Structures are given as C-alpha cells and as structure tokens.
Amino acid sequence: FHPNYSENGYFYVNYTEHNPRRNVIARYSVDPDNPNEADYFSSEIILEVNQPYTNHNGGQMGFGSDGYLYISFGDGGSAGDPQNNGQNLSTLLGSIIRIDIDNPSGNLNYSIPLDNPFIDTQNAREEIYAYGLRNVWRFSWDIETGFLWAADVGQNAWEEIDIIYPGLNYGWNEMEASYCYPPGSNCNPDDFELPVWEYELYVDDVCSVTGGYVYRGNDIWSLKGKYIYGDWCTGDIWAFTLSEDGNHINEDIIRSNINITSFGIDENDELFFCGNGRVFKLQSNEGDLNGDNLLNVLDVILLVNLILAQGYNDIGDLNNDNILNVLDIILLVNMILGD
C-alpha cells in the first residue's frame, strides 16, 4: 500500500506474466464506490523485468521510511544462477531495487533517487540498491533502528539472514551464505557482505527460509528487539538476537508444522504469519503462571506467594534476572494491563 493510501487509494502488486515470461510491478487504485474492492481497470504498469526461467519470480515489495519503493528480484531461476545475474549490475535480477514512484521521470513511470548507490556507475542499473542476492523471500525494516533485514533462500547448503546496506554485494553466485560457491571453488569473502546468520539446509528437515520482522510489539516481552523468522518446510519459527560483539543468539520458539509463506505486523506491531491458507497470530503465554490461559490477578497472587516462599522458581522470573522480586510483579501487572 502507498504510504498515503488513505488519500490516493494506490496499492502495488508484483505478479508474473508469460509470452514473454516476466515480472510485472503494477499500480492499482481502490474502487471509489467500494473501499473493499480494487478498480480492475486502474492498472498502470510501473516496471517489467524479463525472467529467463520459471522459478525465483516472487520476492517482496515495501515502502521505506524515505517514501521510496523497494523491490526484491530473484536471480532469474534455474539452479546456480547460470547467467551470473547475481554479480551483474546491468540487470535487476538478483538485487533489491529502490525507486521513486511519486515523481516519474522521462518515459519511466518512476524515477531514480539521487542517493541510490549506483547513480552514474557505468553499465549499472541505477535502480539497484544492493545485489548479489539469490532469491530474497521477504524483507522488512526494524522500526527502531531502521535496519533493512532480508532472508535469502540458498541453493543446496545454506539459508541466510542479511542486513541490507546500500551498494553492497551479498555474494551470490560466488558465495552461498559464508561459503564459496560451488563448494570447493576459490573466492574471497572479504569482497562481499556476509550474512549475520545462516542455517544449514536439510538438518531437521529445514529447507527454505521465510523472512520476518524485528518484534517491537508489547504482547510478548521476551521477543522484544529480536528478529523473528521461519522455515517454509518445517514451520519452525526462531528469534534471532543481533549482538554487537558478534555473539549472536538464535532461539527456537515453535515448530508450527505450517508451510510459512510470510510474516506480517498489525498497527500495534504485533506479529502474524500465514501459510496453508490461514493466518495465525503469535501470542504469549508469559505471565500465565497458573496455566489457565488467562492473564489476571490470580497470576499476581501466585507470583507474590512464590516470592514470599523465599525460593527461586523460574516460572515467576519474568525478567530473567535469576531473582524473584517486586520487579517481576511490576512486569506482570504491565502485561495484564497491556502496557
């Protein structure tokens, strides 16, 4: 949806066409007579990108806080990137692009932001924001730090999580995650921006990463500030903590057994995910100390009794400081009040 959707009614879609096979980025308008329907005849093509193969045609679109539209494109498909699109700045394949759709320029239905990293770079598409990506399956911004997080689906060995910076090369198809590709080949990792996290394919049946969000909601205190993402095959959902010293932490949250296709957030920054034709919300059982599926004064009474018993019980240690005290009571009351 356009940042000013409430005023202009614009929304954008990314779909595939054939003859020739291509990705189409198009703008539609809401039906002026029905706010729950699109005006089918309002379609305006913004951008088309030819696709040489039948896979890696999806991705992500989203508006940044700068008002520009970011779009990810896969490497064109097949296996191993046979056209070397990931390392080719003259194609939009294998990249995340950044365009201004509010100020069309020349014969384009968009313009190039003047601070895009490859402005005036010879033989480079100036739309490109970052490249060397295989098949980004969902990206999102952390609303507090502004970091752009992306999940890039691997080839045969590794799935990766990246933080995207303008102008950087993320390695594909010379690297798969932090490893030279194909295995046994020579590469220089110093030439590329490496993932902040990676996990191995087919271990415990995982196979394809689905990117999520850094959680900034209030319902699940233990997930605050952590990047929540999943795997399509197993439905595993993890919480990743980025550490300045490099000692990152990846925690298992749940194996949902859902083929997770996407994550989303609502107006309160609470987290949802979808798959198997359904939408699910991540909800907390933190604070439900008595296990009755309710957060209420009975949980406070139980916590007070645990504290008065002068022992330690990790059930009541809501702030994880290895002490049961009034700070846990304050946190529990805030959970109940929704603060």
Regions from the PLM with identified roles:
Residues 289-312, 321-339:
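Alpha-helical segments with a strong preference for the paired helices of cellulosomal dockerin domains
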Residues 103-105, 164-191:
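Mobile, glycine-enriched helix-loop/loop "lid" segments at the mouths of ligand-binding/catalytic clefts
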Residues 72-90, 158-160:
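Short, conserved, GDST-rich strand-edge loop motifs in beta-rich repeat architectures
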Residues 28-30, 99, 161-164, 175, ...:
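Hydrophobic/aromatic beta-strand positions that recur at structurally equivalent sites within the blades
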Residues 28-52, 91-135, 186-204, 242-256:
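Blade-edge beta-strand/turn elements of extracellular beta-propeller
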Residues 259-262:
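Repeated scaffold domains used in trafficking and secretory/extracellular systems
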Residues 122-160:
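Repeat-solenoid scaffold signature
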Residues 1-80, 138-154, 205-244, 269-272, ...:
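Acidic, Gly/Ser/Thr-rich repeat motifs that build Ca2+-stabilized beta-propeller blades
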